[in-house]
Swiss-Prot record:
SUPFAM superfamilies: Group II dsDNA viruses VP (SSF49749)
Protein name: Hexon protein p72
Domain of life: Viruses
Example GO molecular function: structural molecule activity
Presence of the UniProt keyword Kinase in the record: no
Function: Capsid protein that self-assembles to form the pseudo-hexameric capsomers of the icosahedral capsid. The capsid is constructed of 2760 pseudo-hexameric capsomers and 12 pentameric capsomers, with a T=277 symmetry, about 200 nm in diameter. The capsid encapsulates the DNA-containing nucleoid, the core shell and the inner membrane. Plays an essential role in virion assembly. Involved in virus attachment to the host cell.
Compartment(s) where it occurs, according to its Swiss-Prot or TrEMBL record: Virion; Host endoplasmic reticulum membrane; Host cytoplasm, Host cytosol
Membrane-topology descriptor: Peripheral membrane protein
A biological process from GO: symbiont entry into host cell
Family designation: Belongs to the NCLDV major capsid protein family.
Quaternary structure note: Homotrimer. The membrane-bound form, but not the cytosolic one, assembles into large complexes. Interacts with the minor capsid proteins M1249L and p17; these interactions form a rigid zipper structure that stabilizes the capsomers.
Keyword match Membrane: yes
Keywords (A to Z) from UniProt: Capsid protein, Host cytoplasm, Host endoplasmic reticulum, Host membrane, Host-virus interaction, Late protein, Membrane, Viral attachment to host cell, Virion, Virus entry into host cell
Length: 646
């Protein structure tokens, strides 16, 4: 075994290095400490690392402190009151178990669901789209309205997968069912924490949505989606695909743009063929020689690369299915003591208090939706030269009856902490006074054109930051066929539908004067659709006592730049362009230590105003503001109260 060679650390002694490293100070301290230790007669005069770290950081020296013994376990609690059905309230009592309680997560299982069987319609003469006309579909030879003649039109019934259905058949089809996006977030409409009848904090599903948009880190998003019932895409790949490499620096390359007049005038040097061959060796080796010889430079004009495509698909709760299996949800609570173990509530300080978590559950119609189970297929032959056959589809949707979804395994998992009796007694005897952060939320309706201003009367106490969004009323309307998708988005959502036409057959035109014999096409039954969220706030302003704190800032500044710059790893830039953040703290959510606020209890004339081209008398919206407010929790006499209530 070889011995290590001598190693010499070379230190630069420039002016900047003297300031950053302070090597002279370090040498002087080591010498002084040695002299002092020798004067005291210590057998080992060398300084300790802790003495060195009084002035210099030692990167390779780890530290630890002894810690107070602590243990924890999760305890399951059943509802104290309330019927466990969708649309009701459930109240969970927090038992006197353990010395502290910290994390809490709700567990529920939504039962299987499906839609009812329906009879297939028949062909008839009734006008399509007429109110109450639900029995007949268009007759052959007429357009979709069943009134305008259309030569060659033939109609049949198919299911969402193109399989034929016989008209007039009893119990011929049923609609597919699917869950809304993030059903775990929507399930908890409101969550409240009470002690001895005093509400200490509460929040709504809008707050949960905004926390996810701004605060759930990307590396934990997959796990979060699994918990709240949001499907996660699965990656698939194609087989190998052969690609031609196009390099504008390579000679004899075919023109990518026929009208590029500068193509023959380029003065850049040609790429070395050996360089390209090293990166794209596919046409340098054949099947027999691949891997057996060195890459040989070639001068051929074509270089090849073998790749494969990546595809994504989903099959979770948001995918329409005839039968949705039971769905297990795990929903984390968002009170201050749930987020930070340093703020765990000492249960021993409230020995006789009644501690409750009350949850208002969403109704079934907000969670589950139907997808059309029947489509009308129009096949049209158009004679002539060229002759054409076009196939188009339109959904035939009549709402069915979804079975009542059961709600089972309703449990609240409470993380209880245990400490030694000595520490236990300290918390029993001492009055506890701690800084906490609670939710303050205001939802205000607006229908003013172009500009509006709202007084934030529901906000109070010192505010560190606010999450803000303007949500169109249409997003949660029962009339919106996509409300299952739009309910949590702070903007107007439009659908970008891919061109649905595929060419089934195109005859070859072999003479300039002749038309092709046929040209046929077929559309998708359900075309690929991409939702696009359009932010509806152009500019936003914040004023207090008539002083502009934010004066007509573009919405992108608050939706992208503020969360990008502030908050470190605790805040992320949301995907939703309509979700905005305004902070009065330098380090929002980063540290327990406050770093800035505005006390809206003192500045009561606190307004938010905005400009918009969307909102009007018909296109109304709701302004949602979720603020982090500072208060103080006082634990004494067996109860817990907030220091400030107004």
């Amino acid at each position: 075994m070889a011995s290590g060679g001598a190693f010499c650390l070379i230190a630069n002694d420039g002016k900047a290095d003297k300031i950053i490293l302070a090597q002279d100070l370090l040498n002087s301290r080591i010498s002084n400490i040695k002299n002092v230790n020798k004067s005291y007669g210590k057998p080992d005069p060398e300084p300790t690392l802790s003495q060195i770290e009084e002035t210099h950081l030692v990167h390779f020296n780890a530290h630890f402190k002894p810690y107070v013994p602590v243990g924890f376990e999760y305890n399951k609690v059943r509802p104290h009151t309330g019927t466990p059905t969708l649309g009701n309230k459930l109240t969970f009592g927090i038992p006197q178990y353990g010395d502290f309680f910290h994390d809490m997560v709700g567990h529920h299982i939504l039962g299987a669901c499906h839609s009812s069987w329906q009879d297939a319609p028949i062909q008839g003469t009734a006008q399509m789209g007429a109110h109450g006309q639900l029995q007949t579909f268009p007759r052959n030879g007429y357009d979709w309205d069943n009134q305008t003649p259309l030569e060659g039109a033939v109609y049949t019934l198919v299911d969402p997968f193109g399989r034929p259905i016989v008209p007039g058949t009893k119990n011929a089809y049923r609609n597919l069912v699917y869950y809304c996006e993030y059903p775990g977030e929507r399930l908890y409409e409101n969550v409240r924490f009470d002690v001895n009848g005093n509400s200490l904090d509460e929040y709504s599903s809008d707050v949960t949505t905004l926390v996810r948009k701004f605060c759930i880190p990307g590396d934990k998003m997959t796990g979060y989606k699994h918990l709240v019932g949001q499907e996660v895409s699965v990656e698939g790949t194609s087989g190998p695909l052969l690609c031609n490499i196009h390099d504008l620096h390579k000679p004899h390359q075919s023109k990518p743009i026929l009208t590029d007049e500068n193509d023959t005038q380029r003065t850049c040097s040609h790429t070395n063929p050996k360089f390209l061959s090293q990166h794209f060796p596919e046409n340098s080796h054949n099947i027999q020689t691949a891997g057996k010889q060195d890459i040989t430079p070639i001068t051929d004009a074509t270089y090849l690369d073998i790749r494969r495509n990546v595809h994504y698909s989903c099959n979770g709760p948001q995918t329409p299915k005839y039968y949705q299996p039971p769905l297990a949800l795990w929903i984390k609570l968002r009170f201050w003591f749930n987020e930070n173990v340093n703020l765990a509530i000492p249960s021993v300080s409230i020995p006789f208090g009644e501690r409750f978590i009350t949850i208002k559950l969403a109704s079934q119609k907000d969670l589950v939706n139907e997808f059309p189970g029947l489509f009308i297929r129009q096949s049209r032959f158009i004679p002539g030269r060229p002759s054409r056959r076009n196939i188009r589809f339109k959904p035939w949707f009549i709402p069915g009856v979804i079975n009542e979804i059961s709600l089972t395994n309703n449990e609240l998992y409470i993380n209880n902490l245990f400490v030694t009796p000595e520490i236990h007694n300290l918390f029993v005897k001492r009055v506890r006074f701690s800084l906490i952060r609670v939710h303050k939320t205001q939802v205000t309706h607006t229908n003013n054109n172009h500009h509006d201003e709202k007084l934030m009367s529901a906000l109070k106490w010192p505010i560190e930051y606010m999450f803000i969004g303007l949500k169109p009323t249409w997003n949660i309307s029962d009339q919106n066929p996509h409300q299952h998708r739009d309910w949590h988005k702070f903007g107007h959502v439009v659908n970008a539908i891919m061109q649905p036409t595929h060419h089934a057959e195109i005859s070859f035109q072999d003479r300039d004067t002749a038309l092709p014999d046929a040209c046929s096409s077929i559309s998708d039954i359900s075309p690929v659709t991409y939702p696009i969220t359009l932010p509806i706030i152009k500019n936003i302003s914040v004023t207090a006592h008539g002083i502009n704190l934010i004066d007509k800032f573009p919405s992108k500044f608050c939706s992208s730049y503020i969360p990008f710059h502030y908050g470190g790893n605790a805040i992320k830039t949301p995907d939703d362009p309509g979700a905005m953040m305004i902070t009065f703290a330098l380090k929002p959510r980063e540290e327990y230590q406050p770093s800035g606020h505005i006390n809206v209890s003192r500045a009561r004339e606190f307004y938010i105003s905005w400009d918009t081209d969307y909102v009007g008398s018909i296109t109304t919206a709701d302004l949602v503001v979720s603020a982090s407010a500072i208060n103080f929790l006082l634990l004494q006499n067996g109860s817990a109260v907030l220091r400030y209530s107004t």
